[in-house]
């Protein structure tokens, strides 16, 4: 639809090509334009709020001051298309292409195995590319900063950082940039396993073929468009206006035009970076008829330095502010830069670099956000705001009155913020900033603070004091009364005590404060004051500002400089962020193995380069189909209610709306009895799908959902927590129970009995590609083509078939690749596919359904939260004789996979321990939350934490090291599990012993103890955990697989199998198998997709057996084909593969074969409590060392050593990637990830802004992974005796949790507190309970 007349022409460049647009809608973002209008789908959409980095592109503008183009990384989802006039945009397609030339950045991230599912990879590439364009030889600190705004759920970041490090000037690992030795060959502190000349000479550590990297030459990059240079240099910048259907965008060309516009439209918001307005518009549907962009006003970006301070234009970005501050700090005396240094420190943690490149100083100040990092510092630093209007200019203070929104101290109608003046600090003045956040990077603070003190010269007497906090109210809060009462005091501990009392009395945090966590925030108020006190003492001790004749002796006689002991220095330091290092060890292939045989070699993910160039096609990258419609879902806003009515009339009148899909439109089955596709009579949770809107565009569909009127009648009870469910006896299925021996009798014959509780929070899958599906109805025979992001296309096929009441053979489901799954794209994706299919049938047109991040998190469920209770009886030696564990999981409102999860949890609960008397019981609770579902590990990560917590408690009670108690209770010899399945624990002991040796646990524990004795405010902890993970489904039918292999007459081979590529590299492994069996190179082999039309009746790709079963099926097909070719090959042994294939065709020999693997026998009899539910086990061990900040609860991961039993690895690089990714995902579960719900059951932590998965800064500083040598791993069960590693590494992340617990115990010992403490129920494992536990 054409927009109203009067729009100007928008001119910008994309990948070197000029783009001219007249009818520009101000509501369209750069991301939408790139994907929809230009077809540049390499730029991905994952969150819509600028917080995940998948849509990162490079934005270049000509800077008049430096006479050079400025290249920055930005998130395209936040950039309004209207804002691009005069800019050049570079997407991943513009960096390099497989069809033309792959750029070194793209090549290195792929060859470094830095890509798994590949959905985040284009964003990673663009962040690295923008960094190199600005800093051709970056430092490692700059590398980490550049990637802080990019999220990855698969890899664990280590290989991505490794690829970036190859460009760094200060990197010297493994021979790069002039290093003479590999780190393996250098003597050190035990970081690396024994060297190549030692007992592990058959082990290999080279995952990255650095010698194959093409060099990078910065002089060969594309030039900035000369036309844009001329536009920037034009002395007259015209005003630009762009009109859309609902919004008009005006970009004035001069300050006078801006002020006049502001006077006429004082209510219109000013938009610079769109980092606040954009996400609000997306999440809240907030629309402003007029938007004013002052980005092109030079006066608003002017920087002036005078003798009294620094004046910075309001439109300067936060990234530019960092550069401005760095320059001033380097040029000015130290005493003048106190406020500047505090600001510079705070800026390093504000959002990600992409957002800092967009967000403006003025926007940050004027937002008055509660969680502001800068406003507390600016307030205490006595910053002033230069305001301007048509009536003139005025100056106001950024003080408590401005922050509180007092009218006389704020902007008046028609005014704008022109600049911010930051005064230079004075002699004897000290300014510091503080923050504590859920994550070290790219996270809003729980609490931030700015504090300033000025002393009477030559004394310790407080002359002026200012304290401000963010995160404790609706805006930045100051404490003027407390500060006033402390004036004239000396800087002593008595003053500190008084300050804490006064501040806690003045700065009150209401229980209903945004974000809650009142007790934790009050702890931080005091912690920051204490840290401020010590930092000022440290500065005074250094006599930094003293000049003759003023000396310490001329100070007041009532006070002397204290000599800060070294032990106190730990309280002064922030937790540092380091680029991780480490070694990845795996077994070399047999020297006798033919070089063309790829099995056992670290082959790059076969889609790696396509991921890195943006050429890998995901579901929503498929081109728009003729007459395609878009679907958006209408979901419940009540947790438990009767649906009185659904009125779509208003929605149907909106432009573009084609239909409303309700349960009445379903021709077949509406889901199951307890799990409806579309709600009918009542809703059971917030987020349950009621109906769907189908419209011409996705924007129209989403906007129309708010016009569907749903009337409810609330029902009781509303059950949200496990404790509520227990109280209401609200359960989804019968109790699952296993027993061994006689626990009651055993409890009578022990030295000690302990009882305890364990809480494990929920976890969001947070696959980078949200749920999405495209349904295309065909014109005859009720046929449908479905293109989906799913782990289980056969299940989607069945669900759609039953929903539409058509045979399975009319429904074909296609899966090219999936942008991460982790269990979340098994059952729930089928539900979405069925709803979209109903829309397609009703309208007779293709329907595309793509969930945004908030919708995905709201609807699809995640990992089951757990509440566990244990009773353990043990001897003084630490030997456990009896153990009784009761587990409850929060299953949500319907059954889904909850019964299977509780079964698997109970079956695997014993972990690595042989305890003669056991009783395990488990219940799945029914609550009014969205149904929780399958998730990597399937209950084991929650359940195993219970038994390991029990072991830790036993060790504390006995005064023994936890690893000694673990060893004492481990399986020793071939034995039977609690469910009476025999296995050999030999690989478990090898992993455990290897881990202890490589990590040097005794030596490092001694060093940690010595550190702890000297450091009251920083504590270190070490933990080692073993793992026995049973692989597979507990049902024989789920272990079967099929394959189809075609050999074409040119010798090329097409392989199809029933597994789905989720990022785990299953397609790569399958081609390695086919290459070995057919004896042809990988370059002749290809996998196109997974389709229910080629391989029917497939099993979900899950339970870590995808490569096992599909590998056997591919092997079977290839062996069939090779057997057919053998007579021809024997007749012509010198012939080529192509000649043999051609001869077979001439002799009418079939060159197509199916393969089939019947699977493993697996069963479980719950009545008898016995069976053989799993075909084999994966074993492993992990040791982690952490350091915690006792004042804030923050931690740093110093080192992790992992040893995994991978059998005979098909591809060590892929398997190590699975281990590292699972480990970090597990560390996230146990330490950073939090799901919060309102009392009404609404999800509060939706999207990456609130829900924090691990970032690159969360990787251990030293991360060593070893795949156990496979000498004794031969088994006929799996393909080439390999083992599935997709899930098992998840639990090893708990080693971080227990290391933190060990450090907290050390801190509590110092303070005379009990060591055996219970982690609070709220936010188990995050920094909040750790801080409170120490306090």
Swiss-Prot record:
Subcellular localization, as worded in the UniProt entry: Cytoplasm
Show the active-site residues.
1287 (proton acceptor)
Q: What is its EC number?
A: 1.2.3.1, 1.17.3.-
UniProt key word Ribonucleoprotein: no
Q: Does the keyword Nucleotide-binding apply?
A: no
Q: Where does FAD bind?
A: 270-277, 351, 360, 364, 373, 417
* Catalytic activity from the UniProt record: an aldehyde + O2 + H2O = a carboxylate + H2O2 + H(+)
Which ranges carry the 2Fe-2S ferredoxin-type domain?
8-95
Family statement? Belongs to the xanthine dehydrogenase family.
Primary role: Oxidase with broad substrate specificity, oxidizing aromatic azaheterocycles, such as phthalazine, as well as aldehydes, such as benzaldehyde and retinal.
Q: How does it assemble?
A: Homodimer.
Protein name, as recorded: Aldehyde oxidase 2
Gene that codes for this? Answer: AOX2
């Amino acid at each position: 639809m054409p927009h109203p007349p009067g729009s100007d022409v928008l001119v910008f460049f994309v990948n070197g090509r000029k783009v001219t647009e007249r009818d520009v809608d101000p509501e369209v973002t750069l991301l939408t334009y790139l994907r929809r209008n230009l077809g540049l789908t390499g730029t991905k959409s994952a969150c819509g709020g600028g917080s995940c980095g998948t849509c990162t592109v490079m934005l270049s503008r000509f800077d008049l001051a430096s006479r050079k183009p400025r290249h920055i990384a930005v998130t395209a989802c936040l950039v309004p298309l209207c804002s691009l006039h005069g800019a050049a945009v570079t997407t991943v397609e513009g960096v390099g292409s497989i069809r033309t030339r792959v750029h070194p950045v793209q090549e290195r991230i792929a060859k470094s195995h830095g890509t798994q599912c590949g959905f985040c990879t284009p964003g990673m590439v663009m962040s690295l590319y923008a960094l190199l364009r600005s800093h051709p030889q970056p430092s490692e600190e700059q590398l980490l900063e550049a990637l802080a705004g990019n999220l990855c759920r698969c890899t664990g970041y280590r290989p991505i950082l490794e690829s970036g490090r190859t460009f760094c000037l200060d990197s010297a690992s493994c021979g790069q940039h002039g290093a003479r030795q590999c780190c393996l060959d250098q003597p050190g502190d035990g970081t690396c396993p024994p060297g190549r000349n030692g007992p592990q000479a058959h082990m290999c550590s080279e995952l990255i073929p650095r010698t194959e990297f093409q060099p990078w030459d910065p002089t060969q990059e594309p030039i900035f468009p000369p036309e844009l240079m001329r536009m920037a240099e034009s002395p007259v910048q015209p005003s630009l206006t762009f009109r859309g259907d609902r919004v008009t965008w005006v970009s004035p060309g001069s300050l006078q035009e801006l002020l006049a516009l502001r006077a006429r439209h004082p209510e219109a918001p000013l938009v610079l970076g769109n980092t606040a307005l954009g996400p609000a518009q997306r999440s809240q549907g907030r629309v402003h008829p007029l938007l004013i962009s002052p980005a092109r006003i030079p006066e608003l970006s002017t920087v002036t330095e005078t003798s009294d301070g620094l004046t910075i234009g309001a439109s300067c970005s936060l990234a530019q502010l960092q550069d401005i501050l760095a320059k001033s700090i380097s040029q000015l005396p130290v005493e003048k830069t106190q406020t500047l240094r505090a600001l510079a420190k705070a800026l390093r943690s504000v959002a990600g670099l992409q957002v800092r490149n967009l967000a403006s100083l003025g926007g940050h100040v004027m937002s008055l956000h509660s969680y502001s990092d800068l406003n507390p510092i600016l307030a205490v630093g006595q910053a002033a705001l230069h305001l301007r209007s048509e009536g003139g200019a005025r100056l106001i203070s950024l003080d408590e009155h401005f922050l509180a929104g007092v009218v006389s101290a704020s902007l008046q109608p028609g005014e704008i913020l022109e600049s911010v003046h930051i005064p230079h600090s004075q002699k004897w003045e000290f300014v510091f900033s503080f923050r504590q956040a859920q994550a070290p990077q790219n996270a809003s603070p729980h609490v931030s603070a700015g504090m300033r003190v000025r002393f009477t010269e030559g004394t310790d007497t407080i002359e002026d004091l200012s304290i401000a906090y963010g995160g404790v109210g609706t805006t930045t809060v100051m404490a003027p009364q407390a500060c006033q009462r402390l004036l004239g005091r000396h800087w002593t501990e008595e003053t500190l005590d008084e300050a804490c009392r006064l501040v806690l009395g003045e700065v009150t945090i209401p229980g209903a404060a945004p974000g809650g966590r009142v007790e934790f925030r009050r702890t931080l108020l005091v912690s920051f004051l204490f840290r401020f006190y010590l930092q000022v003492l440290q500065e005074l001790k250094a006599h930094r500002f003293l000049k003759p004749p003023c000396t310490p002796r001329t100070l007041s006689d009532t006070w002397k400089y204290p000599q800060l002991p070294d032990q106190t220095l730990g309280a002064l330091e922030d937790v540092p962020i380091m680029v991780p290092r480490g070694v990845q060890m795996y077994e070399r292939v047999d020297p006798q193995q033919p070089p063309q045989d790829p099995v056992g070699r670290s082959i790059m993910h076969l889609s790696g380069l396509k991921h890195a160039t943006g050429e890998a096609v995901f579901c929503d990258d498929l081109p728009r189909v003729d007459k395609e419609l878009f679907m958006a879902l209408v979901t419940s806003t009540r947790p438990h209610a009767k649906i009185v009515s659904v009125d779509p009339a208003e929605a149907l009148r909106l432009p573009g709306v084609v239909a409303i899909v309700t349960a009445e439109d379903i021709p077949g089955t509406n889901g199951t009895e307890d799990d409806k596709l579309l709600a009918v009579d009542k809703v059971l949770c917030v987020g349950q799908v009621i109906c769907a809107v189908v419209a011409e565009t996705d924007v129209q569909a989403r906007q129309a959902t708010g016009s569907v009127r749903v009337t409810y009648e609330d029902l009781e009870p509303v059950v949200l927590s496990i404790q509520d469910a227990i109280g209401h006896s609200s359960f989804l299925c019968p109790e699952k129970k296993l027993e061994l021996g006689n626990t009651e009798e055993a409890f009578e014959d022990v030295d000690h009995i302990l009882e305890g509780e364990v809480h494990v929070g929920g976890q969001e899958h947070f696959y980078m590609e949200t749920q999405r599906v495209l349904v295309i109805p065909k014109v005859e025979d009720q046929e449908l083509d479905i293109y989906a992001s799913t782990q289980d296309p056969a299940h989607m096929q069945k669900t759609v078939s039953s929903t539409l009441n058509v045979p399975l053979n009319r429904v074909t489901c296609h899966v090219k690749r999936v942008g991460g799954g982790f269990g979340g794209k098994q059952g729930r994706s089928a539900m979405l596919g069925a709803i979209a299919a109903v829309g397609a049938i009703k309208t007779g047109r293709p329907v595309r359904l793509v969930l945004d991040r908030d919708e995905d998190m709201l609807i699809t469920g995640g990992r089951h939260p757990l509440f566990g209770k244990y009773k353990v009886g043990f001897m003084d030696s630490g030997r456990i004789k009896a153990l009784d564990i009761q587990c409850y999981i929060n299953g949500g409102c319907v059954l889904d996979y909850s019964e299977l999860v509780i079964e698997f949890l109970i079956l695997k609960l014993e972990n690595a321990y042989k305890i003669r008397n056991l009783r395990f019981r488990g219940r799945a609770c029914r609550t009014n939350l969205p149904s929780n579902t399958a998730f990597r590990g399937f209950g084991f990560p929650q359940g195993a934490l219970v038994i390991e917590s029990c072991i830790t408690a036993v060790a504390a009670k006995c005064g023994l090291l936890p690893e000694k108690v673990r060893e004492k209770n481990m399986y020793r010899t071939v034995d039977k599990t609690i469910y009476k399945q025999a296995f050999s624990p030999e690989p478990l002991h090898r992993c455990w012993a290897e881990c202890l040796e490589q990590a040097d646990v005794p030596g490092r524990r001694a060093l940690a103890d010595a550190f702890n004795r000297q450091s009251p405010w920083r504590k270190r902890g070490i933990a080692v955990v073993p793992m026995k993970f049973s692989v597979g489904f507990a049902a024989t039918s789920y272990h079967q697989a099929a394959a189809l292999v075609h050999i074409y007459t040119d010798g090329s081979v097409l392989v199809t199998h029933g597994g789905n590529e989720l990022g785990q590299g299953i397609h790569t492994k399958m081609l390695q198998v086919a290459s070995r069996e057919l004896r042809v190179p990988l370059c002749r082999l290809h996998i196109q997709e997974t389709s229910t039309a080629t391989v029917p009746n497939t099993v979900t790709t899950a339970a870590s057996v995808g490569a096992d079963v599909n590998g056997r099926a591919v092997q079977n097909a290839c062996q069939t084909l090779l057997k057919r070719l053998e007579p021809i090959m024997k007749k012509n042994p010198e012939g080529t593969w192509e000649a043999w294939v051609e001869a077979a065709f001439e002799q009418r020999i079939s060159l197509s074969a199916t393969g089939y693997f019947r699977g493993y026998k697996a069963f479980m009899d719950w009545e008898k409590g016995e069976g053989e539910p799993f075909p084999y086990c994966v074993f492993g061990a992990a040791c982690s060392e952490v350091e915690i900040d006792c004042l804030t609860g923050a931690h740093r991961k110093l080192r992790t050593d992992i040893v995994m039993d991978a059998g005979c690895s098909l591809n060590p690089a892929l398997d190590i990637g699975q281990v590292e990714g699972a480990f970090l995902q597990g560390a996230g579960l146990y330490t950073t990830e939090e799901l919060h719900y309102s009392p009404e059951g609404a999800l509060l932590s939706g999207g990456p802004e609130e829900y924090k998965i691990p970032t690159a800064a969360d990787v251990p500083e030293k991360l060593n992974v070893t795949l156990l040598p496979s000498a004794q791993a031969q088994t006929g069960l799996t393909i080439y005796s390999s083992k599935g590693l997709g899930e098992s590494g998840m639990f090893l992340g708990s080693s971080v949790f227990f290391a933190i617990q060990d450090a907290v115990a050390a801190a509590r010992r110092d303070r005379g507190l009990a060591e055996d403490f219970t982690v609070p129920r709220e936010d188990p494992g995050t920094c909040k309970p750790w801080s409170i536990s120490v306090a």
